[in-house]
Amino acid sequence: QRQMCIRDSYSTDTKLGLGLVAAGLYRTDRNDMLLPPSNVSLFGDVSTVGFYMLGIRGTHIFPQDKYRLDYTLYFYSFPSKFWGIGYDMGKVDANESDLDRWQAQVKASFLFRIADNLYVGPMASYDYVHGKNMERPELLEGMNLTTANYGVGLSLAYDSRDVLTNPHKGYYLNITQCFRPKFLGNDYAFSTTDLRTSYYHPVWKGGLLAGELRGTFNFGNPSWAMMALLGNSYSMRGYYEGRYRDKHKIEGQVELRQHVWKRNGVVVWIGAGTVFNKFSALCMGRVLPNYGIGYRWEFKKNVNVRLDYGFGKNGQSGFIFNINEAF
């Protein structure tokens, strides 16, 4: 199954734009109806503020679900904002400064099934970030504007979801450990532990309760561009991506999804998150709230186009237009 649409888009970060979305679901063995469908999404966007992006992501499930290939490839150029590093810098409106950023990422993991719903395998990543026209370079604290980051590691996943792109039931856990040592050519040596877990439970006819917890923990010396960021189209929706950044982050959300009529549905969610440079700095006073509402249109079976409006602390808010559920 393949479909494509061209649509107007708007977000608080990138303003008015024109986007392209193409999505496909397929089975590597058409005779095995118990095999979860693989998925691939091609996405592109260009906006009135000079933002442009092109990328592809997906999961390829091999016959009998013996192996899985997860992949992401994208690049974008964005006249963005930068507040500095740490929670205290991000909360000060006066720290807002302009920064032009060009970024590319290639990331993939190849997983072997070692038991029912349990997978493990190697992963690799490459990130290139080029910053220029920095309005207040002192906010970088002496770090390079341009960095290239090479990483290798291991990924462990438990996945009992019925559908990857739009789960109706099941549990998902992924732990990825990525190492970026100096001998791979990195300017900044550090390692990253990513944790993501989510649960999906039907509550009544057409209603689904979904919950998620995410964490990113950097150990060593990550550059400003590779730190943990709050705010994107998947979590802490409504916050400007990267306004709050530090070595570590923890964030969670609970979302109620309700089918309304034919291809139409709505969601509401609440969440919270924070960034910190060491675990002893964790405190309730630095937890940022998040909540929002959204509309869903079934682009194709088990593939939703979503329009979300998220709210955060001190009047922060933003629109998000994307494909597939946030988690």
What does each of the following model-derived ranges do?
Residues 2-5:
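Short, small-residue-biased leader/transition segments that mark boundaries at the very start
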Residues 8-10, 20, 40-46, 56, ...:
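Transmembrane beta-barrel strands of outer-membrane/channel proteins
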Residues 10, 24-26, 46, 60-62, ...:
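Residue-level signature of outer-membrane beta-barrel architecture
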Residues 14-18, 36-38, 50-54, 100-104, ...:
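Residues that define the transmembrane beta-barrel architecture of outer-membrane proteins
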Residues 25-29, 43-49, 76-80, 128-133, ...:
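Sequence/structural signature of outer-membrane beta-barrel proteins
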Residues 29-31, 65-69, 116-120, 163-165, ...:
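Repeated loop/turn-to-beta-strand initiation elements of outer-membrane beta-barrel proteins
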Residues 152-157, 161-259:
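C-terminal outer-membrane beta-barrel translocator/porin domains of Gram-negative envelope proteins
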Residues 153-154, 293-299, 316-327:
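Outer-membrane beta-barrel "beta-signal"
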